[in-house]
Amino acid sequence: KEAERRKAEEQNRLLNMIQNQTAGQLELLSQLMDELERTESREQYDWILGKIVVVGTYLKRRKNLVLTQYTSDRNLLTMEDLRQSLAESCDSLKLCRIRAAYYVEKGNVQLNAEDILKCYDTFEWLVERLSDVMQSVFYRVSQIDDVLRISVHIVSETDLGVLMSERPELKVQQEDENEWFVSCIVLR
């Protein structure tokens, strides 16, 4: 009885934590559902539905990462865990007519779970912020000298510097007329 009670408490604690960490995406889903109900254009309906799938995929994969984190012995996740999450998220972006690809350094290296979550959260933040203006995204995560680095190539006709100003840790450079390079180091 006591073990069952403790297990139920731990499950509730984890679910509450996940809900708190993803409150912004849950709110976004609610807004998108409201938009979906109001839209009369089939094209707009499909676009909004695609965005709902993208956010829903993130919620599902992030929950999986957190649960994997808490079932591991030492609060670790692997690059493979991140790779699987990015694969599913990139696949869902097709519904928004965005070409998406990723590269996560090979190896089943175990890393601090918070670092892996930051990498995935950064991807989602970029997607949410830029899904209306980008045509393609290539998201790369590599580990150099024990430091995780994120580098992103984005094709967009919009000035991304303005859209991403609220995240000063993301360095934004314009490479060509419609090509942008975004980079950051995942700080512990």
Language-model-derived ranges and their functions:
Residues 1-93, 120:
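Signal-transmission coiled-coils
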Residues 8, 41, 163-188:
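Flexible, glycine-/charge-rich segments associated with ATP-binding catalytic modules
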Residues 25, 29-32, 36, 110-141:
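Conserved ATP-binding N-box helix of the HATPase_c
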Residues 57-60, 67, 91-100, 168-173, ...:
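Structural alpha-beta junctions
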Residues 79-115:
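Helix-loop-beta hinge of the Bergerat
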Residues 122-128, 160-171:
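Short, non-transmembrane amphipathic alpha-helical segments
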Residues 138-153:
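Short beta-strand/loop element within the Bergerat-fold HATPase_c
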Residues 151-157, 186:
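Acidic ATP/Mg2+-coordinating residue in the GHKL
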